[in-house]
Amino acid sequence: MAEEQVLNTHNASLLLSAANKSHYPEDDIPEIALAGRSNVGKSSFINTLLGRKNLARTSGKPGKTQLLNFFNIDDKIRFVDVPGYGYAKVSKVERARWGKMIEEYLTSRDNLRAVVSLVDLRHEPSTEDVQMYEFLKYYEIPVIVVATKADKIPRGKWNKHESMIKKKLNFEQEDAFILFSSVDRIGIDQAWDAILEQI
């Protein structure tokens, strides 16, 4: 999609929630998946990019997203919010089910164009963060790393934290890396540019 202005980002809605591929939308609209740990800020990322307060529900309780949530944006693109990983209070059986559901979507969905992998700028990436990045690289799925909660760290320390994250992920320079804050509205244009480049 060459021009961002042809996309009315405010014309967005939750289309459906799916547990497996029999429930996926049947069309060829390109999709961008959003992956990250529970409470990394996926819902806030979606709401901020789409200029909506509560389109994706934010929750103080991690593990709230239990299905693949498909958000329709102007009938031209979809965001797919996948269950957050790394939430300790979810049973092993449930975590395994989520993992299978996410893997099935990421490896078999023709509509998928890229994955936004969200990490917390404040902390070193978790084992699950690293595994997700390695998984996407292995399957040659384009990845956009978004480091959230940049407002929680003084700007003078951003470079240090970015370097820490890139080193832990074994980050490849061809991938986009974006510092983001839904509070201070940092990184919105950069995120859209990286997403639309993949459509």
Swiss-Prot record:
Q: Which GO terms describe its molecular function?
A: GTP binding; metal ion binding
Any single GO BP term: division septum assembly
Which cofactors is this protein said to need?
Mg(2+)
| Entry binding sites for Mg(2+) | S43, T65
Kindly give the Pfam families that the UniProt entry links to this protein: MMR_HSR1 (PF01926)
Query: Which residues are in the EngB-type G domain?
Result: 28-199
Q: Which keywords does UniProt give here?
A: Cell cycle, Cell division, GTP-binding, Magnesium, Metal-binding, Nucleotide-binding, Septation
In this chain, GTP is annotated as bound at 36-43, 63-67, 81-84, 148-151, 180-182
GO CC terms on record? cytosol
What does this chain do? Necessary for normal cell division and for the maintenance of normal septation.
Q: Which HAMAP family match?
A: GTPase_EngB
UniProt lists the family membership as follows:
Belongs to the TRAFAC class TrmE-Era-EngA-EngB-Septin-like GTPase superfamily. EngB GTPase family.
Q: Quote the protein name from its UniProt record.
A: Probable GTP-binding protein EngB
User: What is the organism field in this record?
Assistant: Streptococcus uberis (strain ATCC BAA-854 / 0140J)
Gene that produces this protein: engB
